[in-house]
Each structure stands twice: as C-alpha cells, then as structure tokens.
C-alpha cells in the first residue's frame, strides 16, 4: 500500500480537517517504530529507515507493512485523529484495532525471521 492510498482511505472513511503533511508525519512515525522495534531486531538485512518527508513521493512510496497487515496504517491514523480531536471513546476503539494489527504483524514477523544472535555466555 502506498502513502497516498492510506491517506485517501482515511480521508474517505473518516473525514477530517487534517492535511496530508500531518498524516505523512504519522505514517513516518509508525514505520520508524516498526523498523526500530521489529525489523532491526532480526538478522534480515534491511536498509536504514530515514522517515518520510515533504519531498517523499506519495504515489511511489510503499509503506513497510504489506498485506494482510496493512490496515494498521488506517487504524493508526484514525487513532491519531481521534486523539487530536479529543474523542477518547473513538480513540480507544481505534487504538484497540491498531494494537491488534501491530501485535499480529509483530508475531508473524517474529515467526518468519530469525532474531539477531546474542552471546549465550561470556568468556572471562
């Protein structure tokens, strides 16, 4: 899923007053967390993630998490919108759905990729 697809999906399903730059910042934040907490903790060689900026190609940039877990982006942006609007009941609902997708993705990634090896003992 591309950045523009997520932004258009959220705008269609949850009309809001926030611009693309705010949503881009949220998507960059989420992918940064995914890269740091999940991807970089495994042996798979992944390029460093520098975030998305205003110069990022919204149509040509695919987000880090693919199908079937890509709904995480929708729920993350909806959660951020609900928080900014002070709608705590809606925020809690969006947060629960976001957390479900995040945990499912993390579990699937952990099953499919070997974690970085750590020393089992120290030689003195």
Predicted regions and their residues:
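Conserved short "hinge" loops at termini or chain/domain junctions
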Residues: 1-62, 103-124
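Short amphipathic alpha-helical leader/targeting segments
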Residues: 44, 91-92
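Elongated alpha-helical scaffolds
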Residues: 67-80
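Generic alpha-helical propensity signal that fires on short helical segments
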Residues: 87, 95-99, 116
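Short secondary-structure subsegments characteristic of cysteine-rich extracellular domains
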Residues: 92-106
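Short helix-capping/linker segments at secondary-structure and domain boundaries
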Residues: 80-91
């Amino acid at each position: 899923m591309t950045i523009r697809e997520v932004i258009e999906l959220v705008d269609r399903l949850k009309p809001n007053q926030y611009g693309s730059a705010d949503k881009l910042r949220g998507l960059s934040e989420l992918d940064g967390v995914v890269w740091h907490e999940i991807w970089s903790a495994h042996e798979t060689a992944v390029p460093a993630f520098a975030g998305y900026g205003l110069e990022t190609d919204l149509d040509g940039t695919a987000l880090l998490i693919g199908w079937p877990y890509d709904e995480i982006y929708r729920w993350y942006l909806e959660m951020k919108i609900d928080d900014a609007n002070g709608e705590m009941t809606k925020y809690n609902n969006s947060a629960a759905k976001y957390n479900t997708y995040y945990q499912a993705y993390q579990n699937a990634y952990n099953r499919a990729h070997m974690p970085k090896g750590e020393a089992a003992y120290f030689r003195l």
